[in-house]
Regions:
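Hydrophobic anchor at the beta1->P-loop junction of P-loop NTPases
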Residues: 75
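Residues immediately within or flanking Cys/His clusters that coordinate Zn2+
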Residues: 72
Length: 765
């Protein structure tokens, strides 16, 4: 390590947070006031050739340059601010120093094209082909990911080069690792993870960049796994040990405040955080939660499935995951019934006999068979039926149900026409008065129309959403967890009768990627900003990452998800930097509707239960993420623009510690040794945060005649840098108890911090 670089785990480690801020202060980003009359998106220049990094990207580029000892980082940057570009910029500078690189990008297969597009955009033009030839895309989600990974890194042409690993959407990779550790059914992600840990420990030139806007999904220990990848051994390898340290108990709703300081000290140097949600660059967002009562018929079918789930739960609880909250099996029946229940058409086709996929029958045999004999008969017409044949039978049964609904509603529509009633007349009535409440409107008019009543009985939620889409202005995004049956497949029937014809689908059920991309391109076409070609696009969970949409005015989230992060990702698809630049400034706003079905009594539905579980989980994880943000290397540099979602204080060590002759380590190698030591820094029992008044002074240091401006607190004598919140030293008092001064207007800083000894040369920053 260069003499001028400081690491947190050295005997001067407590200087590290101040050292970063002091040496890289020229990258500090200040908040600019919002002027509704200035279109910032039109001011964004499009330079020819490779685009230049923004200050927060250039900071990381220089921080991780070839000469730097800092080799691992989590790029925890917000949606739409250029995380991918940041990692490419880092590679650009590394390549400029040495061309001898392998760049392994671990990413989902569906995001390959997006990465290639970004590489073409952000790689420097000089030696472009050579830069690109160093890059290898690896799908970490494939069934043979570990084998493919080994093949690529062991290829003879790649041996002898320095390795740069970029892990995109690292939260998904870590989730796979966690699953491997706990289930022990597969080790493909774990093998890659362990290889990376070994390499970062054994090879000083290897670098790892992890990218995520949402670094943790399900449980706090995922952060333990992530940071153990970036700095092996800083957290326990077992989840129970990690939780015992950082949670008070298994019911904790926040990080253990007694050990928050320990957590933050151990991750110093591992995170860059940047959010910057500038009003002028992003559409304004409004969130509305809509609770809708079940129809009587829906509640009857829902109760039927709830009884089944209770029976399954008692007899087959072993099939639940340990947490019991995020498995797809948990409340699967009632979860679907919250969206839609099939109407009673005859004794074979009705809400209670909805076909179920074969996996449920197999995983819950002995219970399911007693309850759904018609399913067993349907799926096992031949005892020797192959899996593909069973799947075909199941799909045909589902399609029969869906087509039966459409035929039934067509008969209702025909009956309405005979009575001179049309759904369009109700649509026109609702659109003519924007003060009408949709719930009240539906309840008032549903019995006047057989079609509307039929739609209402099956799903008041989807009926409400359709009226809402038509009433709103501009293009819409619809998100549902389901593609078939209670999801997009049924929504399309509602759309048909509502005459919503200009819609597109973008989900994993559409196998041909070109068709999906054609839909997205058409929706995003600037000429489609008012929905002339497509005014609704429907997406599923598979498309919540790596897909950018433009000119969306309203988002409809049909049901909750176990992870609020998933919902945030959906919203993030439609609100990105300058994603609404083709619209007039007064139309750059997005309304997000979250729909929840409820009973007429107070008993919670699965919609409400999932939302409560997700909210509680999110709130716990958010306390850990808050700690991560506070400990970010660039916290002081970007704090001013990062606090749109609430204020926070950057992690610091006490001023007196930084002026001490014996500075000390920020953390010790062994976490249990660290627990025994006296905690220092923010959130420790010995640390107190105070607001102090400062005023600007001119001063010299005791060994220099150069006069500079500083901020000065007369009560403590502390002197701070004029540009950033960094302690420079202290002005002592003379025998008359007055601050020491060289002349009438110039103070003398006699007790200096060690920062100047570790100042980087200009060429390094």
């Amino acid at each position: 390590m260069s003499d001028n670089y400081i690491a947190p785990n050295t005997n001067i480690g407590i200087l590290y947070p101040n050292w970063v801020t002091y040496n890289y202060k020229k990258y500090k980003v200040k908040k600019t006031p919002f002027d509704p009359n200035i279109d910032l998106c039109k001011l964004q220049k499009k330079p020819s050739g490779a685009m230049k990094p923004r200050p927060y990207q250039e900071f990381l580029q220089k921080y991780m340059r070839f000469e730097s000892p800092y080799r691992t980082i989590l790029v925890y940057h917000g949606l739409g601010v250029g995380k991918t570009a940041t990692s490419i910029y880092i590679y650009n500078l590394l390549y400029n120093k040495s061309k001898n690189w392998n760049v392994y990008i671990l990413v989902k297969k569906s995001l390959f094209k997006g990465w290639l597009d970004e590489l073409n955009k952000f790689l420097e033009r000089s030696d472009f082909k050579d830069r690109l030839s160093n890059v290898h895309l690896i799908n970490y989600d494939s069934s043979n990911a570990n084998i493919k990974f080994k093949e690529i890194i062991q290829d003879k042409s790649n041996i002898g080069k320095n390795n740069l690993y970029i892990i995109d959407e690292v939260h998904n990779f870590i989730r796979n690792v966690y699953s491997n550790v706990t289930n022990q059914q597969s080790i493909r992600a774990l093998e890659i993870y362990e290889h990376l840990k070994r390499e970062i420990k054994d090879t000083k030139e290897t670098r790892i960049i992890c990218i995520s806007g949402t670094p943790v999904i399900n449980r706090p220990y995922e952060l333990g796994l992530l940071f153990n990848l970036l700095r092996p051994g800083i957290f326990p390898n077992k989840e129970d040990e990690f939780n015992n340290i950082f949670l008070k108990n298994e019911y904790s709703k926040e990080i253990n405040q007694d050990t928050k300081n320990l957590f933050q000290r151990r991750i110093l140097g591992l995170v860059s955080y940047y959010e910057d949600y500038h009003k002028g660059l992003y559409a304004e967002k409004t969130i509305k939660e809509i609770e809708i009562n079940m129809s009587s018929y829906q509640e009857k079918v829902y109760d039927y499935f709830e009884a089944i789930e209770e029976k399954l739960d008692k007899k087959k609880s072993k099939y639940r995951r340990k947490s019991g909250t995020d498995t797809e099996m948990f409340k699967a029946y009632t979860r679907q019934a919250c969206n839609f229940v099939f109407p009673y058409i005859n004794k074979d086709i009705n809400g209670e006999k909805r076909p179920r996929p074969n996996v449920y029958r197999k995983s819950l045999k002995g219970v399911e068979n007693d309850i759904h004999k018609h399913e067993r008969n349907l799926l096992n017409k031949k005892n020797n039926a192959k899996a593909s044949e069973v799947l075909k039978l199941y799909t045909n049964a589902c399609n029969k149900y869906v087509s039966s609904v459409e035929k039934l509603w067509k008969s209702f529509q025909d009956a309405d026409k005979k009575n001179k009633i049309t759904l369009q007349s109700f649509i026109d009535q609702l659109k003519s008065d924007d003060k009408l409440d949709i719930n009240e409107f539906i309840n008032k008019n549903k019995n006047k129309s057989k079609l509307m009543n039929g739609m209402y009985n099956c799903s008041p939620k989807i009926l409400y959403m359709c009226f809402n889409i038509i009433r709103n202005t501009g293009n819409a995004l619809v998100y549902t967890n389901y593609v078939n049956m209670e999801g997009i497949q049924v929504i399309k029937i509602y759309f048909k009768f509502f005459n919503i014809t200009k819609y597109g689908e973008y989900h994993g059920g559409i196998v041909d990627r070109e068709i999906r991309e054609k839909t997205r391109s058409l929706f995003n076409d600037p000429k489609n900003k008012n929905g002339d070609f497509l005014n609704v696009i429907m997406i599923s969970p598979a498309m919540t990452e790596g897909v950018n949409l433009t000119n969306v005015r309203h988002v409809h989230i049909l049901e909750p998800h176990w992870n609020l992060v998933r919902i945030q990702q959906v919203i993030g698809r439609s609100i990105r930097q300058c994603s609404h630049q083709n619209l007039p400034m007064n139309e750059r706003n997005v309304i997000v509707y979250k729909y929840f079905i409820k009973r007429k009594n107070e008993k919670p539905t699965t919609d409400q239960t999932i939302n409560e579980i997700a909210t509680n989980k999110y709130n716990l994880l958010d306390t850990f993420l808050q700690a991560v943000k506070e400990a970010a290397i660039d916290c002081e540099l970007f704090k001013e623009v990062n606090q749109s979602d609430g204020e926070y204080s950057c992690f610091k060590f006490a001023a007196e510690d930084k002026l001490s002759k014996e500075l000390g380590y920020a953390f010790r190698k062994n976490i249990y040794d660290d627990l025994k030591k006296e905690n220092k820094g923010s959130n420790s029992s010995h640390y107190e945060t105070k607001k102090i008044k400062t005023f600007k002074i001119k001063a010299v240091t005791k060994d220099s005649s150069t006069v500079n401006e500083y901020w000065y607190n007369p009560d403590t004598g502390y002197v701070f840098d004029i540009d950033v919140d960094v302690l420079i030293g202290r002005i002592n008092k003379d025998k008359n108890n007055l601050p020491e001064m060289r002349d009438i207007e110039t103070y003398i800083i006699s007790n200096l911090s060690e920062l100047d000894k570790y100042k980087l040369s200009k060429k390094l920053v």
